């Protein structure tokens, strides 16, 4: 089961209330990489069925212009999640986000439901992927188990609000309260070979703070960030897209390593910096990211 979309570009995942047709009919205009159609927290208890119908209709009729269509279903401890998955698969979503994931078994339950519905609605096996949201101390502690749980899982995402509540603290804007979870999650994700995404930044008035937050998680190795407003998209894309300077240096590294390797030379310099074979994968990733972001102009 090898779905090429597991590694697709996901710098931004923008939350949208599935209950409001006006929000989910043309969000592709904002150019987020992924659109998170929300059936969970954004929808009142007595509106779950309405939101699910609205979601199904949007998935069937709206052209999202290449943006990934992710649906956050209701929790596995609610009576709604199974019908949510049925609507997602029948409607044609690309991925499903599991909220409040704490164990590998949570992922297995969703994967089994997806498989049943793919068969029912004639979709290829393994076409619908999974992302698990970690929202508690237990979920973060079990990050590696969750990351290695199922082939359908392409990544994990931090949900900072519920996580800090579980830690008996709160979101400060500094990121200090999230540091441990972020480190644990990115290490687990990289060990398992899946992607890792950061939590939302809710203070829309503090764009300087938002930029700093994005810069920090980029340096930590995250693949992208959940967002709640279109104004946040350009900042995330700017920071997560290689500059031409980065790309040119990466090209030099790849070409030099390829040529020096044939000569048996293991260490050399590029632009005055000492380089060895350990730099190769990072340089290739930079070039691959540039290609996926549409900014690559080279010949590799």
Residue ranges: model-predicted function:
Residues 1-300:
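Expand to "…catalyze enediolate/carbanion chemistry for C-C bond making/breaking, isomerization
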